């Protein structure tokens, strides 16, 4: 046997062109800062050779300031496009899974956000590490999410009927073509293409259509659902196709789209009901119904058993996790619960709820399951 085969691999001696090839091989969906940090953590040579700047970042396709809904005039202010990512952290010697939502503020520096919203978590749990060694954790991107925030440049007042933010934003990309599609004031669907677009355009201006959720599907398409459950899909050229008719009777109060493993699409319909107790005091309860998309039949079919899948319903994005570790197994829906005076800001929120799909019941938990992250 050749003695050289017994020597450990000298990763630091890898030719620079090979290292650049490895970096370029990060596909568009997974190429974010965390994956670059994982590569850079191998050795000092790799850290020096791989910059933190990410040329595949979709935000780079658009200007720093986006036009406001109502006008291309800068006097109305601007939107800034923000990105955050949900990650699943797994340690080889620890069976528990941790979910964490991060926003990169400067290259390599992350801010921890509430899992169900975009609130910054200022006070982390005592057992949450101040630093995460990427050589000790397996990191998987669960969901990438975007939102737009209003930035006033000192101009005039903005009419109150215009929304100053949007948590329902996707970026479509195909080759050199990119576009932002967002749900804004009144549930309308607006888009802005990269390049020379200086004003938002409306995709569907029907007076009786109110869109409630939008979801990126396989990079260059997006799925949109309205308040009645009618669902359509757009491609990067804004060609639209019907996916499913609406729910019988229109369904509940709020629709959420979730993509599961294998490209399966779920519709989570949220009901908020008022019940009367013996004390004549009303109490609101939350109920969810879950539907699976039947594309060939163009309809939603109700699902009674989620198996080992848990669904997470957030303000800006929803996602699924298969067989999560911790105190609760699959078959549950976790969501933000605003019924009891709102949610805590700046700390681990104590207003989160969980719904058992099997038992059709909900409750609020004061301590998050172990796999939630901070």
Curated annotation (Swiss-Prot):
Q: Which residues form the F-box domain?
A: 9-61
- InterPro entries linked to this entry: KIB1-4_b-propeller, SCF_F-box_domain
Protein name per UniProt:
Putative F-box protein At5g60060
Q: In the record, what lineage is assigned to the organism producing the protein?
A: Eukaryota, Viridiplantae, Streptophyta, Embryophyta, Tracheophyta
